[in-house]
Amino acid sequence: MSLIDTVRNTLVPVHREGYRFIAIFFVVSLALGFLWEPLMWIGFVLTAWCAYFFRDPERMTPIDDDLVISPADGTVSSVATVMPPEELGLGSEPMLRISVFMNVFNCHVNRAPMGGTVRRIAYRAGKFVNAELDKASQENERNGLVIETKHGQIGVVQIAGLVARRILCWTRESASLEAGERFGLIRFGSRLDVFLPAGAEPRVTVGQTATGGETVLAEFGSAKGPVISRRA
């Protein structure tokens, strides 16, 4: 293996959405260096933090249509049965909701919790209250996807927070997504809600750390044997 290959395999990829921010931090750091050199080094540290924030590592996603995979890195902040947002059109029956809260240090790339076809994308303007609060799922700015899976329709909702005020979603209606496939990003702290129909059993508890594209949040059916994973 060459030195270049070693470096490439060691460094964590940065998502393209972060390039502009990293460039701005870097240029400002150089400019501050003309005023006072220590400011330049502080700026370089902040530039490195910005690159770390927009990191986009590969993940090993379990291959199983019965598993619901975490759509983001973070902490499980809620496991409850609630009504889904009206704009998703998921009906009038309560659904299992599992929420993953992302702080500013988590990787903020969002991934599909299950494989399927995107049936609806619904954006709703709103407030920017703390995304950890339960009311954030109804009051905050959000963008929801409805995905048709073999177990029926599920919802995954990107929710803005106090700092995060830019929700990005680059998939489209009628698109096919694989479990663990990247579909969006929320800048600087936020939350993802996953809404699941009857038959889904949670496999996580509140306070548990979740890894996007890898951690199993819930499962349809009984537990099975070893699961094969693929790189995503």
UniProtKB/Swiss-Prot annotation:
Endpoints of the signal sequence: none
Modified residues (Pyruvic acid (Ser)): 190
Superkingdom assignment: Bacteria
Primary enzyme class: lyase
Catalyzed reactions: a 1,2-diacyl-sn-glycero-3-phospho-L-serine + H(+) = a 1,2-diacyl-sn-glycero-3-phosphoethanolamine + CO2
Cofactor requirements of the protein: pyruvate
Active site: 190 (schiff-base intermediate with substrate)
Residue numbers marked as site, Cleavage (non-hydrolytic): 189-190
Name by which UniProt lists this protein: Phosphatidylserine decarboxylase proenzyme
Organism listed in the record: Rhizobium meliloti (strain 1021)
